[in-house]
From Swiss-Prot:
HAMAP family, per the entry: Agmatine_deimin
Coiled coil: none
Organism the protein comes from: Listeria monocytogenes serovar 1/2a (strain ATCC BAA-679 / EGD-e)
Gene: aguA2
UniProt signal peptide: none
Designated name of the protein: Putative agmatine deiminase 2
Amino acid sequence: MGQLKGLPVEDGFRMPGEYEPHIGCFMIWPERPDNWRLGGKPAQQNYKEVAVAISNFEPVTMFVSPNQYKNARKELPDTIRVIEMSNDDAWIRDYGPSFLVDDKGDMRGVDWGFNAWGGLLDGLYFPWDKDNQIAKKVCELERIDYYSQKDFILEGCSIHVDGEGTLVTTEECLLSEGRNPNLTKIEIEQTLKKYFHAQKVIWLKHGFYLDETNGHVDNIFNFVAPGEVVLSWTDNKSDPQYEISRECYDILANKTDAKGRTFIIHKLHCPDPVLITQTESEGVEAINGTFPRQAGDRLAASYVNYYTANGAIIFPLFDDPKDKDAQELLEKLYPDRKIVGIKAREILLGGGNIHCITQHLPDKSTIRE
């Protein structure tokens, strides 16, 4: 167990699709008062509901700061493992390890650099050093060897893979000045190919409208299966989201994946604009250097930000009539999985959603034929 030399692509490791079997799921308990209102109490209930829902299908581990351990242990059922781990916030998809597998049944991790979505240029908080240590800690906890790429800034929510050589990301995020400004698009793509074993990288221009992470791909796009994808959509041409989604659709419709397949694209309509209320804004402590939560600001509400569990899809609800439409489409797309909706407004208020707060651990014993 320890840090590896070499490259995953040379060692025969790939990043599996999220729909491939899992060993379990990791999460981090929310608490910071300058991002979560009322000291994180409402968000903790949403996180609890997500964790419990996932735990019905695969084991869940909740990491929690020392100050919150007793509270989290009391709130969460015994079926959920609770482990102390210092952190700066609760978005493990972004700074947890990227897990890789090979066809021999082995697993490895990648420890990327993290700078709170843009560092001192346009990051969302400072410091972020505790978050930047989590990937290594998780690999050591699970006794997984890992590659260290600390000089390359990458969040897990900024990429999606199909497990068969295709990776999708956005230019808005990976080419942002606050991440890897000294690297060209070609150099960034080469790194993605070397570490995820991707044969083809598809670049969307933008992520979801007003996504404060510079347009993470997981809020606008997801793989349902190899060659089949889902895209956040609106028919409202006066909504800025329309042009973004249309542009993404046109790019995908004119691309093939690494296997040469034309994409089957499903449109998952987003809810009507979700705005921060005055009460919600007042519940967040205003601290210099953190992203403000102002009454009337629009949130990046998207049903595409869901978690694919063993035998289930855990997706966000927004108290919108389109909740039902999203449920029905997901049931059609995933006939062999149970579709579970969770009220997720408090997660959304923090800047992300269900996919952002979860990190799956692939089942390394599943060898692809």
